[in-house]
């Protein structure tokens, strides 16, 4: 009789807002430099084709509404950065999707924070190495409740902001994305067969910056509530 060598971890899932449902997470894709002003602050300009990287599904940390989560300051870094992002959850998938098909694949949305060990990322860039240790560490992706598209409609505009200790650090609008969520999904589907349960973090506006132990972080996107957490030593 076949049996596990050891008991596997529970499947990563997100809580669906205003319900008892759970959304099973398959993969977490991320879009780089998808807001022009953020691209500039990172030393780039122009409308380049979207590029992608990934985070492990088990790097997600579910943050419930009206509760402050706790994120441990990660090891091997002295420059941990916050990046506020709209997260898109897919309810269907496929390969080589048209823009219309990509739009129809969107199941819902959440607030996400792409935490980044910026010093390790910079060192990797200089050496032409992958970003995994900078982007895929434990607790690297705090994420809020998942709101079904049936409730929110398509999110293509609306303000988003991030505060650290009550001070506004990031502010923008979803209309400022260089590539829309659907355009990113369509492009991503030319590289991978997308499936239900995939998440896409769609990029961050300008104003990324360092976090220190003890900092309180609050992220908000219109229609998706708020996400808050504290950085623990």
Residue ranges and their predicted role:
Residues 27, 47-49, 56, 82-86, ...:
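A generic structural signal for short beta-strands and their flanking turns/coil linkers
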Residues 2-101:
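Extended, compositionally biased flexible segments
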Residues 2-23, 38, 44-46, 64-65, ...:
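Catalytic-pocket segment enriched in acidic/His residues
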């Amino acid at each position: 009789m076949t049996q596990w060598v050891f008991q596997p971890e529970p499947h990563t899932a997100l809580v669906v807002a205003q319900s008892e449902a759970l959304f099973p997470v398959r993969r977490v894709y991320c879009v780089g430099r998808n807001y022009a002003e953020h691209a500039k602050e990172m030393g780039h300009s122009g409308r380049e084709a979207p590029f992608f990287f990934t985070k492990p599904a088990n790097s997600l940390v579910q943050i419930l509404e009206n509760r402050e989560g706790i994120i441990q300051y990660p090891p091997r870094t002295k420059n941990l950065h916050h990046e506020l992002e709209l997260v898109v959850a897919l309810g269907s998938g496929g390969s080589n999707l048209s823009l219309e098909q990509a739009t129809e694949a969107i199941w819902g949305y959440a607030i996400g924070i792409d935490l980044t060990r910026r010093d390790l990322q910079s060192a990797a860039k200089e050496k032409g190495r992958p970003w995994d240790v900078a982007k895929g560490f434990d607790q690297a992706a705090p994420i809020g409740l998942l709101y079904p598209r049936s409730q929110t409609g398509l999110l293509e505009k609306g303000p988003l902001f991030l505060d650290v200790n009550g001070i506004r650090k990031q502010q923008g609008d979803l209309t400022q994305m260089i590539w829309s969520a659907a355009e990113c999904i369509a492009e991503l589907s030319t590289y991978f067969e997308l499936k239900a349960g995939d998440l896409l973090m769609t990029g961050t506006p300008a104003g990324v910056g360092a976090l220190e132990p003890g900092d309180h972080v609050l992220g908000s996107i219109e229609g998706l509530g708020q996400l808050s957490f504290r950085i623990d030593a």
